[in-house]
Amino acid sequence: MSKGKYVKRTFPLAGLHCAGCAARVEKILNAQTGVVAASVNLAASTAAVEYDTMQTSPERLRQAVQEGGYDMLADSDDDTPDELERMNRERYRDLKRRAFWAVVLAIPVVVIGMFFMDMPYGGAIMALLSAPVVFWLGRGFFVNAWQQLRHRSATMDTLVALSTGIAYLFSLFNLVFPEFWLSRGVDPHVYFEAAAVIIAFILLGRTLEEKAKGDTTASLKKLIGLQPKNAIVVAADGTQTEIPISRIRVGDLLAVRPGEKIAVDGAVCEGDSYVDESMLSGEPLPVHKEPGTKVFAGTINQKGSFHFRAEKVGAATMLAQIIRMVQEAQGSKAPVQKLADKIAGIFVPAIIGIALLSFVLWLVFDPSGGLTHGILAAVTVLVIACPCALGLATPTAVMVGIGKGAEKGILIRDAVSLETAGKIDTVVMDKTGTLTEGKPVVTDIVWANGDDRAKAVFFSLEKLSEHPLADAVVHYFAGVPTLNVERFGSLTGKGIEGTVDGVRYFAGSRRLLDEQGIVVGKELNIEAQRLSAEAKSIVWFADSEQALAVAAIADRIKDSSVEAVRELQAAGIDVYMLTGDSRAVAGHIAEKAGIRHFEAEILPQDKAAFVKRLQTLGHKVAMAGDGINDSAALAQADLSIAMGGGSDIAMDVAQMTIISSDLRKIPEAIQLSKQTVRTIRQNLFWAFIYNLVGIPVAAGALYPVSGFLLNPMIAGAAMALSSVSVVANSLRLKYRR
């Protein structure tokens, strides 16, 4: 049997109206051969499906969904965002139009029912006005209910169709055959206004809900909007042609003019400019780009112009990967949602059972008016029950939370990671590249005689060296003129030498200077000892007679690291630093960063064991790293955080990626997680309370005590409000600090 190829894709869905619909489609997809896992997001109207391409295809999946009474977009990934946007716009416009006319027609029905019931032909006018509301504007409820019935299923639309259909037909019977009741001493009532207003309120509620759901995906739309449509390709003869980005190939030379968006990922070949990367990294300051530096799709060029060579195109660009990550994350389910999903799955059949039970109980205990009261109570129960609030409680909050993270340059892999982040009590971080810049830089330089010529000689010597520390000196002196060095030589383990204008110069260790009999001044010696005590590498520069300068080189702590550590500790989170460096170097870095706990001289394989040791002590551990040597520890941690400048392997393992490598994003992510989980709990609490209180009241539980029987119109308004309030509460997340 051939080995299959597994892919994970997100497909837009049409026809989802409630949590029951989402549960039904999810069940259909998971039942298909070749599907590993499928998850439906009601708030986004999407299905995230992992499947074996050898056993099934998007077209087969779409066919299965269509047979269930729904629809799924199965076109190529490139077309999906635009097509999804078009579908959402059309759905919103259709809902708004139907809601408007339903309200227009329902208002006179309510006015007649409340104030002019005794007017001639009042009942007939109400029947005529409410018929188009129920059976034309509300036809979608009946069509969907019938499709679900054919598949032995029931959803929110089943409840609406049953309640409004029963209310209308019962009223029509009472209007046409009033003597049936009058002969039994019962005054016949009509409930046309209830049927019309229920449809109007639900359509209005769904319109507001659709608008609010659109706001929850605003962050994703913003990311998709970063992708330019066209780019300028430069031919071998220098001619420039504008082409769609879909035609760009790896290796193409592209031109970028001031103010333009960069089309694909690549490396600058010619020219320089500043590029605004804030939409990807969350960093506000433009980044300088010169030959050799990387540029990314979706970022915006400022005032300069440059040419760059395409390295990653289409789905391989960083922006495309971020969009895919955010889509998959927003479509994922938090553990807290599992209970709500189970309840939503059995909700509709249970409500139909409660409605029938309330009808029977009214018939038994109130023989005189029981039929009327029973039908009214059953209709109200069907109307007020709302699985949508339960179904929307978690995904709307997750979508807003993950979208907000993406805007800040924090990529969260899925809802589970988002929920886990709020439980973290310990953060372990690698030193090199995570806490520090990850490359040696000159932190201090002390001169005995620091004229421009001496600087030029030091720079020219180090420029010829292959030692790793030489790059730091060369970078430090960037812009200094290069002098001609003769008789250059490398003294293994000690340093380098060379002659400039007949004078011999040396750069390297103190041992080299001592062997050459070079005099070291007292002040330089004291400075060298001080810098060495700070765990910095020392490079001496001298001529053949005396030491001219001492340079200190170290892997500098990031400006953001100290503040990040302080914020984490202030939040009650322990911070540990791991490094393979000596205890002296580790101790100095930890002290400067304000870290109380550190492990030095630790091997890559020991990092995972250290994380596991903390976990056995009961800690919830987040590991932040940037390299291949961190991948095992990242995989072991409860929450793995990759720093954006690191290796692809670290990012593949990580549940969270900080694009800018700014450690301050870690406390931000933890705070965002806590806010999101708090919002989910609030949503679920109110959704449960609404149904637990509303359904018994609708069934007539208060009638024996107070004579109060809930009007179906009020029930319809309450049901619509419950869904809208859940989405609105989730949207509050966007504006919290």
Predicted regions located by residue number:
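Conserved cytosolic catalytic headpiece of P-type ATPases
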Residues: 1-5, 41, 287-294, 368, ...
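Flexible metal-binding regulatory segments at protein termini and peripheral loops
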Residues: 1-121, 222, 239-242, 320, ...
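Conserved cytosolic catalytic loops of P-type ATPases
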Residues: 33-55, 59, 192, 221-316, ...
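Actuator/coupling domain of P-type ATPases
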Residues: 60, 66-83, 123-126, 130-230, ...
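ATP-driven catalytic headpiece of P-type ATPases
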Residues: 97, 299, 425-466, 494-576, ...
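Bilayer-spanning, highly hydrophobic alpha-helical transmembrane segments
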Residues: 99-109, 338-366, 378-386, 391-396, ...
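Membrane-embedded alpha-helical bundles of multi-pass transporters
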Residues: 115-118, 150, 169, 404, ...
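Conserved ATP-binding TGD loop and adjacent catalytic N/P-domain core of P-type ATPases
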Residues: 500-502, 537, 542-682
